[in-house]
Amino acid sequence: MASLRHRVRAIALQILFELDATDHPPDQVVGRRLEEEQLPPEGERFLRRLVFGAWEHAAHLDRIIEEAAPNWPVSQMPGVDKAILRIALFEALIDKEEKTPLKAIINEAVELAKQYGSDNSSRFVNGVLGTVVSRYRERSKG
């Protein structure tokens, strides 16, 4: 059985995909999904942090994605891949509450890409995240 955090990331992916494809208000979409999913309090908190964090920082995260994948404009990227990358990059670079190891964040993102994306999604997501992590490490050394 999938862990609570994996399940929450999958729900966050679905919510971000919906938000990106529609003009539905984020509060309403999250509220509806929380009613449907019946998550424990820690899962609900994690879901809200992932969704609202990735959504609020989307423009910044999209610039990071485009730097790492210049041949793939975010506007033309499959919605599932974009949502997965936004979640993973939010967790890795912005979220200060969780201390999830980078390797775990990348592994979770790749698993979500295998589960919800196209045949090439997992390689693409892994490549983008690997590029971002190596650039981030280079900048922090300099």
UniProtKB/Swiss-Prot annotation:
Coiled-coil parts of chain: none
InterPro entries (UniProt xref): NusB-like_sf (IPR035926), NusB_fam (IPR011605), NusB_RsmB_TIM44 (IPR006027)
Domain of life: Bacteria
Key words of the record: RNA-binding, Transcription, Transcription antitermination, Transcription regulation
Pfam families linked: NusB (PF01029)
Cytoplasm among keywords: no
GO terms under cellular component: cytosol
GO biological process, one term: DNA-templated transcription termination
GO molecular function, one term: RNA binding
Keyword Kinase listed: no
Gene3D superfamilies associated with the record: NusB-like (1.10.940.10)
Family: Belongs to the NusB family.
Function, in words: Involved in transcription antitermination. Required for transcription of ribosomal RNA (rRNA) genes. Binds specifically to the boxA antiterminator sequence of the ribosomal RNA (rrn) operons.
Protein name (record): Transcription antitermination protein NusB
Organism: Roseiflexus castenholzii (strain DSM 13941 / HLO8)
Name of the encoding gene: nusB
